[in-house]
A protein has these predicted regions:
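N-terminal helix-turn-helix DNA-binding module of bacterial transcription factors
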Residues: 1-68, 358-360
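Alpha-helical recognition/docking segments in bacterial nutrient-uptake
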Residues: 1-13, 65, 69-184
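Bacterial carbohydrate/catabolite-sensing allosteric modules
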Residues: 2-4, 50, 91-96, 147-154, ...
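Hydrophobic packing within well-folded, soluble alpha/beta domains
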Residues: 12-21, 26, 36, 44, ...
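Short beta-strand segments enriched in small/hydrophobic residues
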Residues: 18, 23-28, 63-76, 189-196, ...
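Short gly/ser/thr-rich secondary-structure transition/capping motifs
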Residues: 50-56, 110, 136, 281
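Structural motif
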Residues: 54, 100-121, 241-262
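Generic recognition of short, well-ordered alpha-helical segments
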Residues: 57, 83-85, 114, 140, ...
Length: 360
């Protein structure tokens, strides 16, 4: 071998010779198909490891019809919520012998379409996706993937327009419970940050279902939970207490500031995401108000900072890793041929009561 020349990669034949078996036996062992005894499998794997043999995944996929890869599409891979989901997917997939490819979309439907096409081009066996589509919006890119034989499992979102599995949390139930706890603590004016993004906010509670139909499933479910709590306690719906702006921390600060400037301002805020919490707290600070002495706050998603804040933040804790694990298990069931009807798997969230809510 000339100086600087890379050594030749070990071959299937060399693995077979070292293990004392035929090439076909090595191919079956490393390819994960056919019947191989435990003793033979151990010899083949030991020889492959000793030689540093790396299997040709393309050749394997041509033999088995699978790449043993799951594609995952989420809005923001840096968001702690989606990072938790990704962790759950990865752990479950790895335990079942699957690799994971992840693409972020920034909650952009055009980017989502491109992401799905990219994953299909890479021959993934199935896709787990937190879709950016509204709950009643057509999703031809996902329907096309299903027609092409690629299982789809929705995570954190559900859609009325496609017949496939969805793994979600109990957004509506836990929001009603949380807002009801505020009401039972004496609060009658409760701000809601955020509602679904829309240029035509609800003027009364009867408009809410129309807004929800076009919204992300999770956003819509939380708004429905909020209105459920108001109805349950015979409180009026006030559109001025619901933010429908872009979902950024700055917009949350602006929206809550507007609520605090009302003649009858809220005494509590229910914030549906981490940026909504920090934006709400910033609005209070700008006006010299304190949580919970002046305004109580409940947030969504637990984190280390929520517990060490002063006061510690009362939050809805979503089981992010459980969401991801359940979604991965569901798509693997589909990949491996389990034939059943589409189902919604609902994972329970928990209201963690800390120090950011005061009695009125």
């Amino acid at each position: 071998m000339a100086r600087g020349e890379a050594p030749a990669a070990p071959t299937l034949t060399e693995v077979a010779e070292m293990a004392g078996v035929g090439r076909a036996t090595v191919a079956r062992t490393l390819g994960g198909y056919g019947s191989v005894s435990a003793k033979t499998r151990e010899k083949v794997l030991a020889a492959a490891e000793r030689l540093g043999y790396a299997q040709n995944q393309l050749a394997k996929s041509m033999t088995t019809g699978r790449t043993n890869t799951i594609g995952v599409v989420v809005a923001d891979v840096g968001n702690p919520f989606f990072a938790g989901i990704l962790s759950g997917v990865a752990v479950t997939a790895r335990a079942r012998g699957y690799d994971v490819l992840v693409i972020g979309t920034d909650e952009d439907l055009a980017e989502e379409r491109r992401a799905v096409e990219t994953l299909l081009g890479k021959q993934v066996d199935g896709i787990v996706i937190a879709s950016a589509a509204g709950r009643s919006q057509p999703v031809p890119h996902l329907e096309s993937a299903l027609r092409r034989g690629c299982p789809i499992v929705l995570v954190d979102r559900d859609l009325d327009t496609i017949d496939t599995d969805a793994v979600v949390t109990d957004n509506r139930v836990v929001t009603e419970h949380s807002v009801s706890r505020l009401i039972e603590s004496g609060h009658r004016r409760i701000g809601f940050v955020w509602g679904p993004v829309t240029s035509q906010p609800a003027t009364d509670v009867d408009d809410v279902p129309k807004i929800v139909a076009d919204a992300l499933w999770s956003d819509g479910e939380r708004l429905l939970g909020y209105t459920d709590a108001l109805r349950r306690h015979d409180l009026p719906f006030d559109t001025a207490l619901v933010s429908h702006s872009l979902q950024t921390e700055a917009q949350a600060t602006r929206a809550v500031g507007g609520m605090l400037d009302l003649a009858d301002p809220p005494t509590a805020i229910f914030a549906t995401e981490a940026d909504a919490v920090t934006g709400s707290l910033r609005a209070l600070r700008k006006r010299g108000l304190r949580c919970p002495d002046d305004v109580s706050v409940i947030g969504f998603d637990d984190s280390s900072w929520a517990e060490v804040m002063d006061p510690p933040m009362t939050v809805v804790a979503q089981p992010m890793q459980a969401l991801g694990a359940s979604a991965a298990a569901a798509v693997i069931e589909r990949i491996e041929g389990q034939d059943r009807g589409a189902r919604r798997i609902e994972v329970e969230s928990t209201l963690i009561w800390r120090g950011s809510v005061a009695e009125r």
